[in-house]
Amino acid sequence: MYYSFMTMKQSDDQIRAQIFKALSDESRLAIIRTLYVSGKELSCGEVGEKCNIVKTTASYHFKTLREAGLTATRKDSRTKYVSLREDTFQTYLPGFLETL
């Protein structure tokens, strides 16, 4: 039982480390802030424009945030939309979004 507790704890720590790594960049924080303030999903292009991030750089940041579980992406025809995964923030960083 102790072993399974430690394994589960380690997994949570790995998730937290990935989240903190994703949030350690000012551009990614700007993306999170933009999505939070908008209160809705936005196209990747809209987020890039609002944050003044070029498309290729924005794509890298969106991938990093998605892999950390902080955002979700959906594709509609040729447009990709990104939204916050507020459940992840509530689980691992309660109150964080309100500080933006």
From Swiss-Prot:
Keyword Repeat in annotation: no
Signal sequence extent: none
GO annotation terms (biological process): regulation of DNA-templated transcription
The keyword GTP-binding belongs to this UniProt entry's keyword annotation: no
Keywords, alphabetical: DNA-binding, Repressor, Transcription, Transcription regulation
DNA-binding feature ranges: 44-67
SMART domains reported in the protein's UniProt record: HTH_ARSR (SM00418)
Stored PROSITE patterns: HTH_ARSR_2 (PS50987)
Pfam families referenced in this protein's UniProt entry, alphabetically: HTH_20 (PF12840)
Domain HTH arsR-type, first and last residues per copy: 8-100
S-S pairs: none
One term of GO molecular function: DNA binding
Record protein name field: Uncharacterized HTH-type transcriptional regulator YceK
Organism, scientific name: Bacillus subtilis (strain 168)
Gene coding for it: yceK
